Structure formats: C-alpha cells, structure tokens
Amino acid sequence: GRPWEQIRLAVAYPKLNVKIVATHCGISVGEDGASHQALEDMALMRALPNMVVISPADAHETYAATLAIAEYDGPCYMRLGRSDVPVILPEDVSFTIGKASVLRSGKDVTLIGTGQMVDACLEAAKMLEGQGISAEVINMSTIKPLDSETVLGSVKRTRCCVTAEEHSIIGGLGSAVADLVASEDPVPVMMVGTRDTFGESGAPADLMKKYGLTADDIVKAAKDAVSKKPRRWWRR
C-alpha cells in the first residue's frame, strides 16, 4: 500500500537512518481479526534493498535489539506482536544484527524459529527428544541479513530443517532459508507458517492452533523432514 511505497522511496532507497517498529504482527493479534493481523510484513520489508529486518524472540531480546538498531546507521524494521510471549532468554542477552544463536544442539533435524515461534521450537525439541529425535534449535532473530553461516553449519550436521514463523511462508523466514539451502547445500526444508491466507478473529491460542503454529505442528514437520533425508544421513 501507500505506506510501504513511502518507506521504499523515502527510507530504503536513500538508505536513511530510520527505525521502524511494528506492533500487532502475526495471527496472535487475536480478536481484532484479519485487518489487523500482519502476516506478510516481513516479506514486504525483506524485499526492500538496504532494509534490516528483525523479529526478536522475547522481551529481553527486544530490549537488546532496540539498542542494536539504534546504533546501526541505516534503515531497520523490527517486528513485534501483541500477545504475551514467554521469556526464554537471559536478561543480559546480547544481540548482533545478522547473527543467529543456537539455543539447543542436536544432530537429527534443525529447527529455525523467529519471534514467539522460538519458544514453540524449544518445546517441540523436547517433545522430539522423547521420541528419539535429536533437534537443534536456532533463534533467527534477524531475518535480513540472514545468518547463512549458522544455518549452513547446522544443516551440514543434521541434513534437514524446519522453519517456524508467525507469518506467511511466502517471502518470510522459510523462503529465506530455503533460498539459501537450495543454492548452497540442498536438504529437505519444511516450513511452519500461515499458508497464503488472511487471518480471522478469535482467541490467540485458538488461532495459533487452527493455522498450524504450535509445537505439535513443528514436531510433525520435523518428522516429515527427517523422513525425507537420504537414508545414509539418518542416525549416522
């Protein structure tokens, strides 16, 4: 729309030192419905040259990311939701633009989450562990520039991955990871996110379940990814 065009021409094109913080992003906005649920914002901002795109995992990382983008000389977009998000990172967590963090090591599948889906990835990893699958969890708080080194290093070990985002799978984290992996080290990539759809009004937890954005959905995707690995990689 018109605001995006203004950001494109008046901020990204001249590479101005402007910081944009968006709230009420994702399906968990809840009762406000489709008109208020931004499910394509990361795709729109990621497509803009010069634009940094941030999606922090919790309150502590949001604070650290705010300090980091304030020091960065250039346009930045930071994405926040509306609903309460569990605190999963320490209060003194560090934040570097373009750097992901491995929250849990594993050898069978890589789970890459952003925003509040990082917590769901950690929960899914525990569930998978009980089923004999070792999952590595990556907090990808910077969508652009993507931390290609961390992603490729992880999938080199696990040989498959799942991305999880409270956003459309078109143009967001999943697309970014799939683009990278397809060109550098092709492995199965499964995406957890909304599917070419608008949202609707409802309780946040109910909407997360309906649109397939829960730990159970990540577990299912992880099993699917593992099943698609070449057999020589499974349980090496």
Predicted regions and their residues:
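Thiamine diphosphate
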Residues: 29-30, 79-236
